[in-house]
Structures are given as C-alpha cells and as structure tokens.
C-alpha cells in the first residue's frame, strides 16, 4: 500500500477550522493564503509520496547496519535526504534570514505530518536536526 497525502483534508482544516484567511491578515503573513498553502502541500506530498514513502519497503529489506565501526544506511536514504535538504524542507518553518522558508506553523505542520506519515524512520533524522 502506498502513501497518499490527505491534501484535501488538510486544506479543509486550514480554511474552515484554523482560518488561514485570518492568518494571512497578520503582518508578515500576507503572502500565505489558501492558494499558497495548497501549492506547498502539493509539492510536499509529491516528495513524500514519490521519494520518501518507497523507502519503507527498502528499509525493511535492507535495514541500516553497524558493523566493524561502520554505519551502512538503507539504500536510497542518503539520496532522499539530499533531496530533502535541496528542496528546502528542513527549513520550512525557520526564518528566511537563516535560510529557511519562513512559512507559518500551520503550513509547516502539515508538511511535517506528511513526512512522518510517509516514513517515520526517515523523518526521525530531520526531526532531531530541527530540534537541535
């Protein structure tokens, strides 16, 4: 079974429950309306569905290992992490002056949820980095 991001549900929550329109009225968040949220979520979903989710199967077949002082990661994890960083997903919520995207937590949380749902084993590394 493959991962399908619940974008429609997330957008419903953002618009009808969280009031993203009110968020867009706040200083500094004028550019973050429902259309922006949808574009970000669709791109995050594409990355999570196409790149991250398939790592689950590969991780089951070829798990990371520590042998003779060397760590061997699951095939594909290193490449996926590189794409994660290059895509700017690590800094979704972080201020732009520090290299982040400066997105509101409302949008960033949905991106994080998709990452965790698509492969928790992959998502643990960025999660720890984000908390550092």
What spans do the regions from the language model cover?
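N-terminal glycine-rich flavin-associated loop
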Residues: 124-132
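Amphipathic, small/basic residue-rich leader segments at the start of a protein or domain
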Residues: 1-124
